[in-house]
């Protein structure tokens, strides 16, 4: 486990929303309230977070892809950074409708982005002022909208979503396609439809950073375990090889 209860407390994971905004479906995960703010029961959060990271670790070990989604201001930078560290795709600016359900069209845009990036690398982009300006605007827009998924050649195997209420469209698309969702769920949202619920504060920058770091660590560990198994299997196969010399 790469996190502790103390870290969660320091990050404010246990602070929910004002009691008047609560979603009754989150009742099983609420400890109580203080100053009209719901307090999330971290004794429930810890095992659920462990279950979510175990799933992510196993999926990464099978070369699965987990798409990180966090477009809220306090989540953008850390989501992009931790997803990149784990070698996973991410959406940090805005979710484009149809990003999953209309992935065929998205793949066309990804192909165009790569072609334009190749032009920049080769120095063959338009040189005429007006055309150059249009080229720069288009590539900047594509990089902003889909830059985080430019290496995602197929639909992801799972979504990791910070703030399920803020990303309802992304979750709806995933559910429609049968893609599992790991989601941070605060007291003002519903955990229904989320395959791996992480009850916790989705507004605190420290809490968001903790979720993203722990998830990235789990993925990296899963990849490393998979690689070690391959190396050990190869070593075992070489040990079994016995050279037989020809009789004199």
Curated annotation (Swiss-Prot):
Gene Ontology molecular-function annotations: structural constituent of ribosome
Pfam families: Ribosomal_S2
Similarity annotation: Belongs to the universal ribosomal protein uS2 family.
NCBIfam families referenced in this protein's UniProt entry, alphabetically: rpsB_bact
InterPro entries to which the protein is assigned, alphabetical: Ribosomal_uS2 (IPR001865), Ribosomal_uS2_bac/mit/plastid (IPR005706), Ribosomal_uS2_CS (IPR018130), Ribosomal_uS2_flav_dom_sf (IPR023591)
Coiled-coil positions: none
GO cellular component terms given for this protein: cytosolic small ribosomal subunit
One biological process term in Gene Ontology: translation
Superkingdom to which the source organism belongs: Bacteria
Keywords (A to Z) from UniProt: Ribonucleoprotein, Ribosomal protein
Protein name, entry field: Small ribosomal subunit protein uS2
Signal peptide range: none
Alphabetical list of HAMAP family matching this protein: Ribosomal_uS2_B
